[in-house]
């Protein structure tokens, strides 16, 4: 009985850590890029990936949290590099969108990921779902259309970036299912991050130097005036790794259904917390639109489960 209770507390603690790190990194990204005025989303993403590279190595090679899996061929490496590029695009575009959009609206758009996943799965693998599954995507898209039309802080460029980030995130999940589908090439999410993060840094470094000129010099100058920026960047980057770590652990210690429910609720919690902190204006119509999208996502998950 005591072991079961301890296990329950451990799972609750894991879920709380997962929520805190997810919502924390989102809010801190928004604060840095928008409120603090640190307008360098590519450099910020590079900091995240550098932390993920270092901390992944510590967790796997030193702490042995999971067994280390090796890359077995050049083809497998190229597949991981392709995934890493799409992953980079999704994170960078997501961070760019946070400069222009409130977190609440950003999350509403992000909730349309199942729509893009279904589209890419059909276009790339010709995988067709049951008609009922496609029908449940109607409220997902309709909700975002309603939320967009009534969003007081709507910004077209931010909106396009957020849609692109959501589409890239969906594309990565579809490609991952195709590229790493054979038993010999399958990697757990911790090992995949161990290899993807350094490759992402290689992609992001030239992009940062070309598109965000002298960002290192600007950051050093900022640190001289306000050293808090260094702590913000270090904490934010470590938090970005803990999002992945807690996501892996929650997946391992809960069922797929529990994870789905928690994932849907997480977006709603992030919306409420961000509105309370940033006090961005929201409309009743916008919140109804977001609620419709979340309901659509829940129906979509249920329809997919039943069609299996």
Swiss-Prot record:
It is a multi-pass membrane protein. It comes from the Eukaryota. Keywords: Membrane, Sugar transport, Transmembrane, Transmembrane helix, Transport. The chain crosses the membrane at residues 9-29, 42-62, 77-97, 100-120, 130-150, 154-174, 192-212, 229-249, 258-278, 281-301. It holds the Pfam family TPT. Residues 29-147 form the EamA domain. The keyword Membrane applies. One of its GO terms (cellular component) is membrane. InterPro entries: Sugar_P_trans_dom (IPR004853), TPT_transporter (IPR050186). It is found in: Membrane. Belongs to the TPT transporter family. TPT (TC 2.A.7.9) subfamily. This is Probable sugar phosphate/phosphate translocator At3g11320. The lineage of its organism: Eukaryota, Viridiplantae, Streptophyta, Embryophyta, Tracheophyta.
